[in-house]
Design a protein with these regions (language model features):
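N-terminal chloroplast transit peptides
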Residues: 1-3, 7
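A short beta-strand-turn-helix
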Residues: 10-40
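Short active-site neighborhood of thiol/selenol oxidoreductases, capturing the structured segment around
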Residues: 31-67, 73-74
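Short acidic, S/G/P-rich loop/turn micro-motifs used as interaction or catalytic elements
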Residues: 48-51, 82, 238-239
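Short, surface-exposed basic-aromatic patches at helix termini and helix-loop junctions that form
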Residues: 65-66, 88-94
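Thiol-based oxidoreductase modules, predominantly thioredoxin-like and allied folds used
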Residues: 69-84, 96-104
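Thiol/selenol-based redox catalytic cores and closely related redox-interacting motifs
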Residues: 102-238
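A short, polar/charged loop-to-alpha-helix boundary motif
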Residues: 237-258
Length: 261
């Protein structure tokens, strides 16, 4: 369903000009900020309490000024309710006006996003199997990357920070530099971010996940051009797989952000 054969690679991800799903255009039709005339980045998050949703928001927030400079308007849509959205924004720093919620996964399904593993026994056995890498491509290797470090990924903490996970005693971030160096993602650095996120979610589970029927539902990313054509789409297939380039989750935006710098 290509409207054009124009394409170019971004870190091994091929961008094509495609038709935007009607379900997405219908969802944003009444939102003035999402009107045609500007590029729009629409992120379909999973459950508000999903680790992918947390990490995706934490990747987006520091880049909001660059998105604005590039003329790209952002909208995130997650599964949950307003109480969960309020807490999510307070924790991640996501501006509340950029996040909307859906009570179920109907929009995700209409956009052909993966429902995740559907194992006998319901969503909880399915989620546990996905966490073990079953029916969830790339999950185990991504978990491991959080512990081993990644020289192709950016540093997560400044040396002067004191990291509180809510589980361990406060950690001086300078320990990561002494243990692994600086200027890249050090061993255990990303795992510490994930531990902090996990503690926040588990302590407030019912707020973040008011309906656990959709805990395996996966998300997706849609970048729309000013004429509503689709510049980029990514549909994730597994837990901790919200980007095709997890070491730099927003690498697909490089052609537009770098041009605006």
């Amino acid at each position: 369903m290509l409207a054009s054969t124009t394409e170019f690679p971004v870190h091994r991800v091929v961008i094509r000009i495609m038709q935007t799903p009607e379900a997405l255009l219908s969802r944003i039709a009444d939102l003035p900020a999402m009107a045609a005339g500007s590029k729009r980045l629409i992120v379909l998050l999973t459950q508000l309490g999903d680790f992918d949703s947390m990490e995706y928001a934490q990747a987006l927030v520091p880049e909001l000024p660059r998105l604005e400079q590039a003329g790209i308007r952002l909208l995130a849509i997650a599964i949950g309710d307003q109480a969960g959205a309020d807490r999510f924004c307070a924790f991640t720093g996501m501006p509340s006006e950029l996040l909307q919620v859906e009570p179920d996964a109907r929009l995700h399904q209409a956009l052909d996003l993966s429902p995740g593993l559907q194992a006998p026994g319901g969503p909880w056995p399915s989620l546990l199997l996905m966490c073990a890498g079953i029916g969830s491509p790339g999950t185990l290797s991504e978990v491991l990357r959080g512990y081993t470090g990644d020289r192709s990924a950016p540093q997560r903490f400044g040396d002067d920070e004191v990291v509180s996970t809510g589980v361990l005693p406060p950690i001086p971030a300078g320990l990561f530099r002494r243990a692994g160096g600086e200027g890249f993602q050090r061993p255990f650095e990303l795992a510490t971010v994930r531990l902090r996120n996990m503690n926040e979610v588990l302590r407030n589970w019912s707020t973040y996940v008011p309906d656990d029927r959709f805990i395996t539902q996966r998300g997706g990313t849609f970048l729309l051009d000013s004429d509503d054509s689709l510049l980029y789409v990514y549909r994730d297939r597994g837990i901790l797989g919200f980007s095709a380039t997890m070491q730099r989750p927003l690498a697909f935006l490089d052609p537009w952000l770098n041009h605006a710098d």
